[in-house]
C-alpha cells in the first residue's frame, strides 16, 4: 500500500507540480541577516557573491584574527543530526577549512562535487592525492593521505590531519562522490543511497562526534539534497511522520538556498521513498543498491543531461531536464525508479571520457594562463625597475670614478 509520501510523489508527478512546489518553498523561506559575509575583508573568502552564511548560524573560527569562513551549522534537534554545510574551499581558504575541521572535532568530510566541472574550477585541491603531505602554515596543520579506496562513482580517502604546534593527529574520512553533476542529480537513488549508507556506517554522522562537513561548490544544492535525505530517513527511523517540505524549510533557516532545482527536490523524494524500504526492515535492499550502483566497475566520469535554463537563483541556474512529459510518467513509482537506474553503458562511458578530457584541458589552460600572468607580472616589474637600475648603475660609475680621481689627486698633492 502506498505511503503518504509515495502518494504525494505520484500526485506531484501527475500534476507536474515540481516547479510550483519548489517556488513555494523559495517564497516561504525566511531571509536572515548575513552582514559578516559582506565585510570587505571577507569578500575574498566567498566563492559566490550571493551565497553567504547567516550571521546566527555561521561557523566561527576560534583563536583566529578573522573568525569568518563561508560555512553554516545546520542543527536538526529532532533528528539529533548536525551538519556543517560549506562551499568548496578556495585556494586562500583551504587552511581555514582544515582549522574548522579540527576545531569542530569533525570525523568525516563529504565532498559532492569534482574539482573541475564543465570547464570551471569548483573547488581547490585541499587534500593530498599522493604520498606527499600538504602543509597549511597559516593555521598550522598538515594533511597526509593514508589510504584510498576508488569505486566507480565515489572514492573514500583516509586522511591524517596533524596539528603542527601540538603534534596531535586525527584520522579523517573523506567521502568523495565523483559523478554528481552540478545543478543535477545522481544517476539513480540506488547509487546515491549506497553512498549515503557508506557514510552512515562509518559512524561519522552520529551525535557522539563533531558535525560532518558536507560541501559541493556553493554548499547549498547537492549538499542540501544529501542533508535533507539523511535527515528525513533519520526521522522515519524514529517513527515520526515527516513533511518533506517542512523539513526543508526548517533546514533553510540555517543556510540559504538549500536544494537548488526542482529536479533535486524530486530526486530527494525518490531517495527518501527508496531509503524507507531499508528502514522498514527489507534486509536485501542495501545489497540491491550496491548491485544497481555498479560501484565495483572501473571509475567513470559524470555526464550532465541537457538542461532547459529557466531562471537564476543564488547566482546559479535552475535547470530542468529536457524530457517529454507524457502519460508514461504516471505508470507507477517502481517503474520510474527502475528507469532512472538504467542507462546505456557504452554511450555513458564515451560521454564521461569526453567530459574528463574537457576538464583536464580546462585545468591545463588555467595553469598555463597563471604561468603567463606570472611571467607578464615579472616582465612589467623588470620594465619598471630597468631604467631605475640603469640610472643607479650610471650614477655608481660616476661616483666611483669621482672617488678614484679624488683619491689620485690627493696622492699627487701629498707627494
From Swiss-Prot:
For this UniProt entry, the molecular function terms from Gene Ontology, in alphabetical order, are: integrin binding; non-membrane spanning protein tyrosine phosphatase activity; protein kinase binding; protein tyrosine phosphatase activity; receptor tyrosine kinase binding; STAT family protein binding; syntaxin binding
Cellular component, GO annotation: cytoplasm; cytosol; endoplasmic reticulum; endoplasmic reticulum-Golgi intermediate compartment; endosome lumen; nucleoplasm; nucleus; plasma membrane
Q: Where is this region: Endoplasmic reticulum location?
A: 346-415
The outcome of changing residue 304 to A is: Alters phosphorylation by cyclin-dependent kinases of isoform 2 but has no effect on its phosphatase activity
Q: Which residues carry this modification: Phosphotyrosine?
A: 22, 68
Q: Taking every annotated instance into account, which residue ranges of this chain make up the domain Tyrosine-protein phosphatase?
A: 5-275
- Broad class of enzyme this protein falls into: hydrolase
Tell me, what is an example of a GO biological process annotation in this record? negative regulation of transcription by RNA polymerase II
In this chain, substrate is annotated as bound at 182, 216-222, 260
Which InterPro entries does this entry report, sorted A to Z?
Answer: NR_tyrosine_phosphatase (IPR051985), Prot-tyrosine_phosphatase-like (IPR029021), PTP_cat (IPR000242), Ptpn1/Ptpn2 (IPR012265), Tyr_Pase_AS (IPR016130), Tyr_Pase_cat (IPR003595), Tyr_Pase_dom (IPR000387)
Induction, as annotated: Up-regulated by IL4/interleukin-4 (at protein level).
For region Mediates interaction with STX17, the annotated ranges are 376-415
Record PANTHER family: TYROSINE-PROTEIN PHOSPHATASE NON-RECEPTOR TYPE 2, TYROSINE-PROTEIN PHOSPHATASE NON-RECEPTOR TYPE 61F
Q: What does this protein do?
A: Non-receptor type tyrosine-specific phosphatase that dephosphorylates receptor protein tyrosine kinases including INSR, EGFR, CSF1R, PDGFR. Also dephosphorylates non-receptor protein tyrosine kinases like JAK1, JAK2, JAK3, Src family kinases, STAT1, STAT3 and STAT6 either in the nucleus or the cytoplasm. Negatively regulates numerous signaling pathways and biological processes like hematopoiesis, inflammatory response, cell proliferation and differentiation, and glucose homeostasis. Plays a multifaceted and important role in the development of the immune system.
Describe the family membership recorded for this protein in Swiss-Prot or TrEMBL. Answer: Belongs to the protein-tyrosine phosphatase family. Non-receptor class 1 subfamily.
**Name of this protein:** Tyrosine-protein phosphatase non-receptor type 2
The gene from which this protein is expressed is PTPN2
Amino acid at each position: 500500500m502506498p505511503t503518504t509520501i509515495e502518494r504525494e510523489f505520484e500526485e506531484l508527478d501527475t500534476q507536474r507540480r515540481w516547479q510550483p512546489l519548489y517556488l513555494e518553498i523559495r517564497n516561504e523561506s525566511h531571509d536572515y541577516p548575513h552582514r559578516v559575509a559582506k565585510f570587505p575583508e571577507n569578500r575574498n573568502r566567498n566563492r559566490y557573491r550571493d551565497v553567504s552564511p547567516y550571521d546566527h548560524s555561521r561557523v566561527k573560527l576560534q583563536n583566529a584574527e578573522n573568525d569568518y569562513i563561508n560555512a553554516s551549522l545546520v542543527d536538526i534537534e529532532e533528528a539529533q543530526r548536525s551538519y556543517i554545510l560549506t562551499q568548496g574551499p578556495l585556494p586562500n581558504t583551504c587552511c581555514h577549512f582544515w582549522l574548522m575541521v579540527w576545531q569542530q572535532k569533525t570525523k568525516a568530510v563529504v565532498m559532492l562535487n569534482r574539482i573541475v566541472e564543465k570547464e570551471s574550477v569548483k573547488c581547490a585541491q585541499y587534500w593530498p592525492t599522493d604520498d606527499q603531505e600538504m602543509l597549511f602554515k597559516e593555521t598550522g596543520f598538515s594533511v597526509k593521505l593514508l589510504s584510498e579506496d576508488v569505486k566507480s562513482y565515489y572514492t573514500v580517502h583516509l586522511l591524517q590531519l596533524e596539528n603542527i604546534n601540538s603534534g596531535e593527529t586525527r584520522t579523517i574520512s573523506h567521502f568523495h562522490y565523483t559523478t554528481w553533476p552540478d545543478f543535477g542529480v545522481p544517476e539513480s537513488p540506488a547509487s546515491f543511497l549506497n553512498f549515503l549508507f557508506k557514510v552512515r556506517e562509518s559512524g561519522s554522522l552520529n551525535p557522539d562526534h563533531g558535525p560532518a562537513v558536507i560541501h559541493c561548490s556553493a554548499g547549498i544544492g547537492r549538499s542540501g539534497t544529501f542533508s535533507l535525505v539523511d535527515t528525513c530517513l533519520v526521522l522515519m527511523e524514529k517513527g515520526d511522520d515527516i513533511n518533506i517540505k517542512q523539513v526543508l524549510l526548517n533546514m533553510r533557516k540555517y543556510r540559504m538556498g538549500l536544494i537548488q532545482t526542482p529536479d533535486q527536490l524530486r530526486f530527494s523524494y525518490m531517495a527518501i521513498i527508496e531509503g524507507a524500504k531499508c528502514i522498514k526492515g527489507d534486509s536485501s535492499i542495501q545489497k540491491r543498491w550496491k548491485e544497481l550502483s555498479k560501484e565495483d566497475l572501473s571509475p567513470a566520469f559524470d555526464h550532465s543531461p541537457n538542461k532547459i535554463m529557466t531562471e537564476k537563483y543564488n547566482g546559479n541556474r535552475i535547470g530542468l531536464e529536457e524530457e517529454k512529459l507524457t502519460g508514461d510518467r504516471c505508470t507507477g513509482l517502481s517503474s520510474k525508479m527502475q528507469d532512472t537506474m538504467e542507462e546505456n553503458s557504452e554511450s555513458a562511458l564515451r560521454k564521461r571520457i569526453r567530459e574528463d578530457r574537457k576538464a583536464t584541458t580546462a585545468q591545463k589552460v588555467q595553469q598555463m594562463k597563471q604561468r603567463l600572468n606570472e611571467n607578464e607580472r615579472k616582465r612589467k616589474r623588470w620594465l619598471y625597475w630597468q631604467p631605475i637600475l640603469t640610472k643607479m648603475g650610471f650614477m655608481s660609475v660616476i661616483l666611483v670614478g669621482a672617488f678614484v680621481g679624488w683619491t689620485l689627486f690627493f696622492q699627487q698633492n701629498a707627494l
